[in-house]
Swiss-Prot record:
It comes from Ehrlichia chaffeensis (strain ATCC CRL-10679 / Arkansas). This is 5'-nucleotidase SurE. Keywords: Cytoplasm, Hydrolase, Metal-binding, Nucleotide-binding. Its main location: cytoplasm. SUPFAM superfamilies: SurE-like.
Length: 256
């Protein structure tokens, strides 16, 4: 099986190195490629590089660095770099979870979505970490990821245009739960600084809200807080079909 690894934290991030170690140790791939951004692109969502030259650096025959966003990196990886399309794309392991409303900001999920648009099985992988110490424990992915990949690839109901988003908790995981995305808006602290000139600079700091305000029992937010690995299927047709149906009924009675 040909597996393509990518991320949004950058080619030199620890998470993608750990991911490659896990894939190699699991023996699930006969061919492993790494195509990742040059620098950290956290929070860039599905932004793309247009109308300017994008440099690609060859590290080895199967490892490449792209000086662009995760979505662009994946697009070029699939269209120009890896040749025959991979059997699986793994995006991560992201430093920090991608849950609730954060999924639309996530470059990790965006890279996986780019592959899913081409009907390639794609899994976005994220690891919660201690925001105070900054330490990341990779034991949960090492323990659970192979089994999760095997299980998902064997799922006949998996529409390959759907991204599977896997989030690992900070503590030793109790098990796995399939969950909904949930609603989660992190607390944003804005630091304001007046510069010597006439400009003002702002720094936005993102922190998690109190756990009591974080989610329902069946969503990824609450399940993570309870110590479970969460698996959430994400589709990127963002149409609200309930509202669409009501608007279509409304339109029937209008003379516009």
């Amino acid at each position: 099986m040909k597996v393509l690894l990518t991320n949004d934290d950058g080619f030199h991030a620890n998470g993608i190195k750990v991911l490659k170690e896990i894939v190699m140790a699991a023996g699930i791939a006969s061919e492993i490629w790494v195509v990742a951004p040059l620098s950290n692109c956290s929070g860039c969502g599905r932004s793309v590089g247009l109308r300017h030259a994008i440099e690609v650096y060859k590290v080895s025959d199967t490892e490449f660095i792209v000086n662009s966003t995760p979505s662009t990196t994946m697009f070029l990886g699939l269209k120009e770099i890896v040749g025959e399309k991979p059997d699986l794309v793994l995006s991560g392991i992201n430093s920090g979870v991608n849950i609730g409303n954060d999924v639309t900001y996530s470059g990790t999920i965006a890279a996986a979505a780019e592959a899913a648009m081409m009907s390639i099985p794609s899994i976005a992988i994220s690891q919660e970490y201690d925001g105070r110490s900054g330490e990341i424990n990779w034991e949960n992915p090492r323990k659970f990821l192979k089994g999760i990949v095997d299980m998902l690839l064997g799922a006949p109901s998996w529409d390959k245009s759907t991204v599977m988003s896997v989030n690992f908790p900070l503590i030793s995981a109790k098990g796995i739960k399939f969950t909904s995305q949930g609603k989660y808006m992190p607390y944003n602290k804005i630091e304001k600084k007046k510069n010597a000139a006439s400009s003002i600079s702002y720094t936005i700091h993102r922190t998690a809200p109190d756990k009591d305000s974080r989610g329902e029992s069946d969503d990824s937010i609450r399940a993570l807080d309870d110590g479970y690995v969460t698996i959430t299927p994400l589709k990127f047709d963002m149409t609200d079909f309930d509202i669409l149906e009501s608007l279509m009924l409304l339109n029937e009675g209008c003379n516009i």
